[in-house]
């Protein structure tokens, strides 16, 4: 948690940006795993954390711009709770720590909101992502879940504020990235033939937990790198395979890191693995060189895709104009995801508010396969923190589908692609801060080039 002045300033800026109405913040409650008292790891809503800094369950908050009131709604803990969970700060103490002087019991929130509505005032809320939030909004505001789209002025104001990271936020993110890098470096040194994927996951978890960190998302650690979000960790690791890791640490403050590595299970890459890896490495490095204020990140995505197509042409996998192939979408056979996303208090920062606002500033997204998965398209600005994570994949089911449909035969040499059918996938990822003149990598350097990776094996 930052100093209370940080939260006071954030709320003041938000009030000025929205202008009028009542801003409603729904804090997260505990979630039962398989029964009520056996809960998932608690995680506060990120916008609640950003403006109120309190990582406690059972709280909601209101910023009443019209009446100039800031209120945290919650309940004092019962003696039963204290017996089981220990001494906790009072509600007033929690609120005071973040510059809030007014607290009210949870039961009074419904009445407060109903009164504001009866007065003809607007109650702004952010899009809900938890079922209990949807039920609360239906109860408090009379909105059925299908119509709970959120207040656009509120969403836009939050996105604009949270998109630009302050110096103290950057310091936290850098710490998270340092620990994330340590996780990847430890795994790169640790992997050996005969292990199971879950042993590598345990090694990374040890690094995170030894720094009092949680994971910023469910770890991807797999010999099946062609599966983009593969959370199964039960495979035996064999000589000659590639091992793909996508993992990150989350600090107690909530700020995240997110990096990816691809490692040969053997001491070195095979010639075929190295050839594809070097193409992916070129995609990554050319993308990083292009980072600067003002460049649309969609343009950087297109650049990375063209670099890939040119490299795959040299291997005989594709043919024709790289520019035409990317424009038509043929590249997505090998690169079916985006180049990166915003990162901060969420690993995909503010994704719950809608990519259309966070990464597109309200402009429509492409519907083209591959391109539609680009989460960040807008021109980059100083203070943005985002990932750079191009990849190359050989997905048998996608290859079979496109070949059967006769798709992009002017660009794709399917007979040659068939030779790579069981190759897997390669993705490497770093986190970058956009500066006034360019960009800066956040966190320790992880091995990126084939030689750097092999040096740790």
Whereabouts are the PLM-identified features?
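Active-site neighborhoods and metal-handling regions in enzymes and metal-associated proteins
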Residues: 1-457
């Amino acid at each position: 948690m930052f100093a209370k002045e940080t939260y006071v300033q954030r709320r003041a800026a938000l009030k000025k940006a929205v202008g009028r109405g009542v801003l409603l913040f729904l804090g997260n409650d505990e979630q039962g795993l398989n029964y009520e008292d056996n809960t998932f790891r608690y995680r506060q809503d990120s916008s609640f954390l950003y403006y109120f800094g309190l990582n406690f369950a059972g709280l909601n908050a209101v910023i009443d711009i019209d009446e100039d009131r800031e209120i945290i709604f919650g309940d004092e803990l019962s003696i039963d709770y204290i017996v089981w969970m220990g001494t906790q700060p009072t509600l007033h103490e929690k609120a005071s720590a973040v510059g809030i002087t007014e607290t009210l019991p949870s039961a009074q929130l419904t009445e407060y909101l109903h009164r504001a509505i009866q007065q003809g005032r607007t109650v702004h809320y952010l899009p809900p992502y938890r079922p209990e939030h949807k039920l609360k909004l239906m109860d408090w505001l009379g909105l059925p879940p299908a119509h709970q789209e959120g207040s656009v002025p509120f969403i836009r104001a939050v996105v604009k504020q949270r998109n630009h990271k302050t110096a103290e936020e950057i310091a936290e993110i850098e710490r998270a990235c340092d620990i994330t890098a340590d996780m990847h470096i430890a795994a790169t040194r640790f992997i050996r033939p005969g292990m199971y994927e879950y042993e590598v996951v345990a090694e990374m978890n040890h690094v995170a937990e030894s720094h009092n960190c949680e994971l910023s998302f469910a770890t991807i650690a797999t010999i099946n790198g062609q599966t983009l979000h593969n959370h199964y960790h039960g495979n035996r690791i064999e000589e000659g395979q590639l091992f793909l890791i996508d993992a990150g640490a989350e600090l107690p403050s909530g700020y995240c890191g997110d990096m990816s590595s691809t490692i040969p299970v053997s001491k070195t890459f095979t010639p075929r693995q190295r050839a594809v890896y070097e193409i992916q490495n070129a995609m990554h490095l050319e993308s990083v060189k292009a980072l600067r204020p003002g460049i649309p990140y969609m343009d950087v995505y297109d650049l990375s895709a063209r670099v890939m197509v040119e490299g795959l042409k040299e291997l005989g996998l594709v043919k024709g104009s790289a520019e035409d192939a990317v424009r038509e979408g043929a590249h997505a056979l090998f690169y079916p995801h985006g180049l990166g996303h915003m990162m901060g208090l969420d690993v995909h920062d503010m994704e719950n508010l809608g990519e259309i606002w966070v990464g597109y500033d309200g402009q429509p997204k492409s519907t083209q396969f591959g391109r539609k998965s680009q989460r960040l398209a807008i021109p980059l600005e100083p203070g943005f923190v985002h990932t750079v994570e191009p990849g190359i994949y050989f997905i048998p089911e996608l290859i079979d589908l496109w070949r059967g449909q006769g798709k992009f035969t002017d660009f794709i040499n399917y007979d040659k692609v068939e030779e790579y059918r069981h190759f897997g996938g390669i993705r490497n990822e770093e986190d970058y801060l956009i500066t006034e003149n360019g960009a800066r990598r956040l966190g320790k350097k992880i091995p990126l080039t084939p030689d750097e990776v092999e040096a740790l094996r």
